[in-house]
Amino acid sequence: MTLTRKTLFLLTAAFGTHSLQTASADAVVKAEKLHASANRSYKVAGKRYTPKNQVAEFTQTGNASWYGGRFHGRKTSGGERYDMNAFTAAHKTLPIPSYVRVTNTKNGKSVIVRVNDRGPFHGNRIIDVSKAAAQKLGFVNQGTAHVKIEQIVPGQSAPVAENKDIFIDLKSFGTEHEAQAYLNQAAQNFAVSSSGTNLSVEKRRYEYVVKMGPFTSQERAAEAEAQARGMVRAVLTAG
């Protein structure tokens, strides 16, 4: 594909930095040494919690929430700086660090996150995920969602979500007209239809989201994301 200056402009406008952020891949599971102090018994509001001292199979269902800008940059229980754009989570007792698959039981969307913080300590919520994870799970506007969490043991296959249809959110808009215009331009510039992948507009609570998919595997979704990243890289580096 020959990139003219007009095409470069259109590509940059059609596929911005925000879209790359929302289309990022899940956390990469790897064996890590458990944090010494973050896994000690602790007390919050008069209640004592005893974190698990090893990564093992574990499943839990309940409500999830997410935390964002107010906590961005603050230290987590694991001593790292919280990044709302990374795929991380807070849990009251799971080992730090460890990995879990979180599945939204309402829409079947799932994401793998790295547990590096403690919480949530209010209401009946079982896990707090980052803003990026909430976006991928499709509940960033609602604030909470009913989820299933499954501990992933490094070296074992990650649990597979029941709904294998995977979508990548490209960008969100306030009106359907804006979303449709973006979809038309993106389809033209990226030739999405030629790869057998469709673009569509989904109306969510307060926004219209242009998404790419469905994909039947994380690998295929990652390939599509890499292709999109490569296209944007070409846009940014072409002279």
UniProtKB/Swiss-Prot annotation:
Leader sequence segment: 1-25
GO biological process terms, semicolon-separated: cell wall organization; peptidoglycan metabolic process
Annotated Gene3D superfamilies: RlpA-like domain
Keyword Cell wall biogenesis/degradation set for record: yes
All residue ranges annotated as the SPOR domain in the record: 160-239
Top enzyme category: lyase
EC number: 4.2.2.-
HAMAP family per the UniProt record, alphabetical: RlpA (MF_02071)
Name of the protein described by the UniProt record: Endolytic peptidoglycan transglycosylase RlpA
Organism (species): Neisseria meningitidis serogroup B (strain ATCC BAA-335 / MC58)
